[in-house]
Amino acid sequence: MSILHAIVLGLVQGLTEFLPVSSSGHLEIVPWLFGWEDFGSDVRLENAFDVALHLGTLMGATYYLRSDVVRYLRAGWGWLRSGVGTAPTGDARTSCLLAVTAVPTGILGLLVVATTGDLGGRTWLVATCLIVFGVLLWIADRRDDRDGRGMVDLSFSNAVVLGLAQGLAFQPGVSRSGVTLSVARTLRVERTEAARLVFLMSLPVIAGAGLLSAADVTVPAGWWPPFIVGMVAAAVSGWLAVHLLLRLLARTGLGGFAAYRVVLGFGVLTLLATGVR
């Protein structure tokens, strides 16, 4: 793998992980579009690179959200130390809600690994998911924000639903942030609050998936430079994606992302149908 390819894929992963456009879908489409075959048939090496990019993205996003992460960890730990004799309130309740969202996502992830191992490799399905979930994102985001709820206003059953929705993103093209933003907006969560919720929900899932996959990863000596460069590119672009989306949603909606998904999906299907790629 060239350093240029590593930089491009790192930037693509970091930017699209938190924008509602599907990072896994883009990581399949970009090499397919340009005819890159950096890994050949070595699926284990490709998965190792994917883990590196996700861990880079995790570092960038965690750094950006560090005050929120520390705040909710402290609140949750304080509630646990108090003996959990009373129902959590405020930040402690939000911390518990975030923890609950990770459970169904983790269970679905383990089921995917145990039954199929990998849901990628079908470009037509990635394109279809981009279109379908792009339309759903547009529909969900049309909700009026004047009665918007905060994270703390969600119920624990809402948290389970959000976690299940996040689990759908194991299929490339769905988008973890896109599907959870759609559900959060359907649950009447205010737009910027929904984005912050989605980012915080994703951190333990990305970390858990990365650690689980890292246990089975072996990186050949000659591959360390592109792995490190890709990870750094993903960290920087992941930080930037969180920053840009939060600023953007303070002023406008998600319609532009929905339109991009639909156009990209139909573009890929057209290339497939005409035999260009």
Residue ranges and their predicted role:
Residues M1-R277:
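Multi-pass membrane proteins that catalyze or facilitate reactions on polyprenyl-/lipid-phosphate substrates
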